[in-house]
Design a protein with these regions (language model features):
Chain A
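Alpha-helical transmembrane segments within multi-pass membrane transporters and channels
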Residues: 96-141, 283-284
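Transmembrane alpha-helical segments in multi-pass inner-membrane proteins
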Residues: 234, 244, 248-310
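Transmembrane helix-bundle core of multi-pass membrane transporters
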Residues: 3, 129, 133-195, 222-225, ...
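Cytosolic-side transmembrane-helix boundaries in multi-pass membrane proteins
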Residues: 1-32, 214-221, 291-333
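Helix-loop-helix "hairpin" substructures at the membrane interface of multi-pass membrane proteins
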Residues: 103-111, 117-122, 174-248
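Single transmembrane alpha-helix segments in multi-pass membrane proteins
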Residues: 26-30, 42-95, 124-131, 264, ...
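Membrane-interfacial amphipathic/re-entrant helices at transmembrane-helix boundaries
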Residues: 1-60, 96-106, 332-333
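Inter-helical junctions in multi-pass inner-membrane proteins, predominant
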Residues: 35-48, 148-151, 171-173, 193-199, ...
Length: 333, 503, 324
């Protein structure tokens, strides 16, 4: 970024401060309340946390770009499930099995292609019909989930490939495969958003769509690209996760859109578009996962996490508004 | 004017939308080094014509020539590539991006892999900013700039190509006088370089000050081009509206009653300080000042939309506390707001429902709203204000600006207020409706209403007011009676030059 | 003249297209399979749509007021679980008002956040979706909730009973729809909801207390949710914690299908009812045609997009979006 002024620093620092508070809280509270003897800040525990952040995290990174654009994608959970079904099912096809190890890249490719195609359908509809992305993806969230169920009924789709499992469980420089995927995606998207014309145009479009149109930026194709990107990332998230688990239920990925959006909003991206940062979203993702693990660590019901995250999301919104108030002179509307 | 061959020529442009012929064979030519005014009432087709020229609309018929070459403006870039650039009325900037990114919006310099060439971007931007002599740099966030500086960014954007023609669409709408001077300097500079300028504005003084020729549109068709030096305001107006307009300052005087509203030492944070004035029944008090002088904020405070930090408001001699518009309405204060579409009307609602909105809670029989009572109110003000609409079911968004404004006025008259505040009564309204609304305001005063008119247009203030309060930077500089006021001392007062400040 | 009648026709389709589509849809399905318009079938469809329908009525108020409510699904789970739990503890006669009270408190909380604190409704209700889900799980300890003595209670009337042959869920849906329809179209409150959703600033400038109106729309929504929870609990007399999960989006789909704009200021109760029925009959019609149950999701998707698309296409006068 070329211009970082003070308010930007506060905004982008807030999520990391929040993470620090969480770490401190759970470490101290854990000493008194923890059900196990393990310390919370244990490096192994933290590495696991990063790995567990990956599935939602990779989607949330894509969601950041879509939301900076001023759009939203509610269908990511369904795309995630559909890609997973294609991934695992395709590995069981007879001709694929005859390929041996080569079936892996092909099934990966098919799964990723599925994500891109489903994303492209969303993008094309948004572009060509002019219907709001919220409605378009609300619809396709239902529709794509329908496709998942039609594919295999209510049965889980399973295929365990040990080569894949080994790959997914491998560690490089201490980090799990999934963590590497998360970090590499974050790095690439960060470069895209801060250094490339496409990224800067994404901000411009979200900031002032009419101005972007007037300046000759082709907004429609731009949207299409970003929906394809988030479709791709949803599929990538599925590929990373299901390579290891090997079995997908047709209901998997439900509510992922809500988790991803929560992470993006916690990271400070504006709902109206035009402002946001990839790195802060990464912070949002980690903060949520930390909360999940931390609450478990201090022996609180795992279900409480929903309650806490919901209230924190609202609190963040409230604080943000208080910070942006102009004081008593403001118009009472 | 030297008679050179035109740099830009529009020939017989026709543009039809479903149900409307927005442009009906319009022709226009622009010579190098001239400032060419394009005038017409709202809806006359100016914007459509410029959108055709800018490649945002495709004409159904007609040709566009740049120099001798015919050009098809199929997309916004085509216009720019041909040296035709636009400075839009509504700022089209991305607040969160830097000045440089905004100036080169849509054409950021690229390196390999789609990367932005920041170095080139900043060098190019600085070169342009130097030419404009502005006090900000390429890396400043646009959201941090003042409106006038944002306008300069828009102008800088036009200079990224070596333009042959620059189109200014209502550029002075939100500028202060000193900022206007800077703008006119830029225009003069363009002119001296042989660039042609199309200047769209409603403001006659500006038109006569800086333009060489004036072309007029009415109802989508071309009505003629005049040499500015050989014409006057009346002729242009006649061409625009098809008839003569009475702009005389003579108004019928009438009896005034007691003081209806008194404001004592009212302040609201940094917006305005220590403001005192009175309005009598049957009197029109005009508030005149520059944009940002605090006039609208005073009106909003009296109407309960802002919390005063000090001071009193008295109605009929009684001190009142007003914490919300509901309070204000209950005490007989009405506000016709500045932003008609944003604050005055629910555009998707029909005429009647808009008009009865403030009192819908009272227009009931039993628990239900009374159709009869509502229609009765609509009919009354429909007739009284001569609102032209096919019927009350018409959606307000489909009416013309003038009729929309009358709906808002009707809405507040139907509340039978003691004090009626009208903020920018004729902004964005065509000339014909303007004078109707001026007459209406005078009539209301004659009927005994206490009226406050807030306006940025001097002729309007002079025309309708019995007394004028001049404001500058949140303070009342001076009060004028009709006898005292001259254009000169009024301008001095609102520029902060007046010595004899009346507290 | 031809142009006028054409404009009139497209205007009519824009306004009433959903009703025309509904009629065409019913006729086609009726021809394809006469059982479709069998009275028992129709009654069955309406009955199974009633819970969704009751929730959609409340959300219609919220959406017309210019906001969203994504919390209704998890709120419905909450009220179902609570009323089932209290049924055995304090008896149905007290359990029902207690559950209504608690659900209305949730609605009031959301209304306070969105109305008085002016927070973004999408995020607030998204947060509340999660928070209320957590609340329900904490309340139930994650267990399913069942009424101990399923035969010895009159509590099942709201979900299973009937009056002169009309199932009570249908009756409740119909009465509530009629009542709320009148509130929306014939009262000052209804008009204010339209004004606040159509242009909130203009509403405030007209002396309408926007915060209070928004607050009340959420209160109405939570009332409808409590009603739906009651019907759900009474129908099954036992429930999972997640009984309402995902319903928020189906509800929203019904409201949008009915033609309410997410920007606020437009929509009617009648059209929402049509939207609910379309969703119900699609599901039923596809089943009768022998299609997989889940095909309805895909069809619903296509129908929602088409409905909204044609609506805005009629308004802008061209089919495809002008954005390049």
């Amino acid at each position: 970024m070329s211009n970082i002024n003070r308010t930007d620093l506060i905004k982008q620092g807030a999520i990391w401060a929040f993470i620090a508070v969480e770490l401190a809280f759970f470490s101290i509270a854990g000493k008194f309340l923890s059900v196990t003897d393990a310390t919370f800040m244990d490096p192994e525990n933290m590495l696991l946390l990063l790995k567990q952040s990956a599935p939602i995290g990779i989607i949330a990174l894509g969601m950041t770009i879509v939301m900076i654009n001023g759009n939203i994608d509610l269908s990511v959970g369904a795309i995630f499930a559909m890609s997973a079904v294609i991934l695992l099912d395709s590995m069981g096809w007879a001709w694929m099995q005859s390929l041996g190890v080569w079936s892996i890249p092909i099934s990966w490719g098919l799964a990723l292609l599925t994500g891109v195609v489903l994303g492209a359908i969303n993008g094309l509809i948004v572009w060509k019909t002019g219907v709001d992305a919220f409605i378009v993806t609300l619809g396709s969230m239902l529709g794509y989930r329908g496709l998942v169920f039609m594919y295999n009924g209510e049965q889980p789709t399973s295929h365990l490939n040990w080569t894949l499992v080994d790959f997914a469980e491998a560690r490089f420089l201490g980090l799990h495969t999934a963590t590497w995927f998360l970090l590499v995606v974050a790095l690439i998207l960060w470069l895209v958003m801060t250094r490339t014309v496409h990224g800067r145009n994404a901000y411009a479009i979200g900031n002032n769509r009419e101005a972007a149109v007037n300046a000759g930026i082709r907004v429609g194709p731009h949207f299409l690209w970003n929906f394809m990107l988030i479709g791709f990332l949803s599929a990538l998230s599925a590929v990373v996760f299901y390579s290891e688990s090997g079995s997908v239920n047709p209901n998997d990925g439900m509510l992922y859109e809500l988790w991803a959006i929560t992470a993006v909003v916690l990271g400070g991206t504006k709902l109206t578009g035009g402002y946001g940062s990839i790195i802060s979203t990464l912070g949002g993702v980690i903060a949520i996962q930390l909360l999940r693990k931390g609450l478990g660590h201090i022996g609180s019901d795992t279900e409480t996490v929903n309650l806490v995250i919901g209230l924190i999301l609202i609190a963040v919104l409230f604080l943000d508004r208080q910070l942006n108030r102009k004081g008593k002179e403001e118009l009472r509307v | 004017m030297t008679d050179q061959s035109p740099i830009l020529r529009l020939e017989n442009i026709v543009k039809a939308f479903p149900g409307v012929r927005a442009l009906d064979g319009v022709s226009l030519d622009l010579r190098p080094g001239e400032v060419h005014a394009l005038m017409g009432e709202n809806g006359a087709g100016k914007s459509t014509l410029m959108k055709v020229l800018g490649g945002l609309h495709q004409p159904n018929e007609g040709k566009i020539y740049i120099g001798e070459k015919q050009v098809v403006m199929d997309r916004p870039q085509t216009a720019k590539q041909n040296g035709v650039v636009f400075i839009h009325q509504e700022l089209s900037l991305a607040d969160e991006l830097s000045v440089a990114e905004n100036i080169f919006l849509g054409e950021l310099p690229r390196k390999s892999l789609g990367r932005v060439d920041w170095e080139k971007l900043y060098t190019d931007t600085d070169a342009i900013l130097d030419r404009l002599n502005v006090g900000f740099n390429a890396r400043t966030r646009v959201g941090d700039l003042s409106i006038a500086n944002q306008q300069m960014v828009e102008i800088a954007r036009a200079l990224t190509v070596d333009p042959r023609a620059v189109i200014f669409d209502e550029p002075t709408a939100s500028l202060t006088d000193s900022e206007k001077v800077v703008l006119f300097d830029v225009i003069a500079d363009l002119q001296s370089r042989g660039v042609g300028v199309i200047y769209i504005s409603h403001r006659m003084e500006e038109i006569f000050k800086i333009t060489d020729r004036i072309s007029v549109l009415r109802d989508g068709s071309y009505r003629g081009t005049l040499n500015t030096a050989e014409t006057n305001e009346e002729d242009v107006t006649q061409l625009m509206i098809g008839r003569k307009l009475d702009l005389s300052r003579n108004k019928v005087q009438h009896e005034m009653g007691d003081v209806a509203l008194e404001v004592r030492n009212l302040s609201c944070g940094k917006l305005f300080h220590d403001v005192s004035f009175t309005v009598r029944k049957g009197e029109v008090v005009g508030f005149y000042g520059l944009v940002g002088a605090g006039r609208t904020e005073i009106a909003e405070t009296i109407f309960g939309l802002r919390e005063p930090s000090a001071g009193k408001i008295l109605l009929d001699g009684q001190e009142v506390t007003i914490n919300s518009p509901q309070d204000a309405i209950a005490r007989g204060i009405s506000l016709v707001p500045e932003d008609r579409k944003g604050q005055g009307l629910v555009l998707g609602m029909n005429c009647r429902d808009n008009m009865t909105l403030p009192q819908i809670g009272e227009l009931t029989s039993g628990p239900f709203t009374s159709d009869k009572a509502e229609v009765a109110i609509f009919d009354k003000y429909h007739d009284a204000l001569d609102i032209r609409t096919p019927g009350w079911r018409q959606t307000v968004g489909n009416l013309s600006g003038g009729n929309q404004q009358k709906i808002v006025i009707g809405k507040w008259l139907s509340m039978h207020p003691k004090v009626l505040i009208v903020d920018e009564p004729t902004r964005g309204i065509d000339v014909g409706s303007k004078s109707e609304i001026h007459n209406l305001i005078r009539d209301l005063a004659a009927q005994g209403y206490a009226v406050i008119v807030v306006s940025s247009e001097m002729p309007e203030v002079l025309h309708v007011s019995d007394r004028i309060v001049a404001m500058f930077s949140g303070r009342v500089m001076r009060e004028f009676t009709t006898e005292e006021v001259t254009e000169n001392n009024l301008v001095q007062a609102i520029s902060g030059l007046s010595e004899d400040r009346v507290a | 003249m031809a142009e006028i009648s054409k404009a009139g026709l497209s205007g009519f389709l824009a306004r009433q297209g959903i009703i025309v589509a509904f009629a065409v849809f019913m006729i086609v399905f009726a021809i394809a399979n006469p059982r479709f318009i069998d009275i028992d079938n129709i009654s069955g469809v309406i009955r199974s749509s009633a819970i969704l329908g009751v929730m959609a009525l409340g959300v219609t108020f919220v959406v017309i007021g210019g906001n969203l409510d994504l919390s209704v699904g998890s709120m419905m789970s909450f009220s179902t679980i609570v009323v089932l739990d209290l049924h055995d503890k304090i008896g149905p006669a007290l359990a029902i008002p207690a559950m209504f009270g608690m659900t209305l408190c949730l609605g009031a909380f959301i209304g306070f956040l969105v109305g008085y604190l002016k927070l973004n409704s999408l995020i607030v209700t998204l947060g509340m979706l999660s928070a209320i889900h957590g609340l329900t799980l904490t309340y139930s300890g994650g267990q399913n909730m069942d009424i101990a003595d399923k035969r010895g209670t009159w509590f099942n009337v709201f979900g299973q009973g009937d009056i002169i042959g009309i199932p009570i869920p249908i009756l409740m849906f119909a009465l509530l729809a009629a009542g709320l329809g009148v509130v929306l179209s014939r009262t000052a409150f209804g008009r204010k909801v339209y004004a606040v959703g159509g242009n909130g600033t203009a509403a405030v400038f007209s002396g309408i207390p926007r915060a209070r109106i928004v607050f009340l729309t959420y209160l109405m929504s939570s009332f409808c949710v409590a009603m739906a929870g009651l019907m759900q609990a009474s129908r099954s007399l036992g429930s999972q914690n997640t009984v309402g999960q995902g319903l928020e989006l189906e509800v929203l789909a019904a409201v949008i299908l009915g033609g309410a704009s997410l920007l606020g200021g437009s929509g009617t109760i009648f059209k929402t009812v049509i939207g609910v029925l379309i969703l119900g009959f699609i599901q039923n019609g596809l089943l009768l045609m022998g299609l997989a149950f889940y095909a309805q999701y895909v069809v619903t998707w296509v129908i929602i997009i088409l409905a909204v698309w044609l609506d805005i296409a009629a308004k802008r006068g061209r089919l495809l979006s002008p954005i390049a």
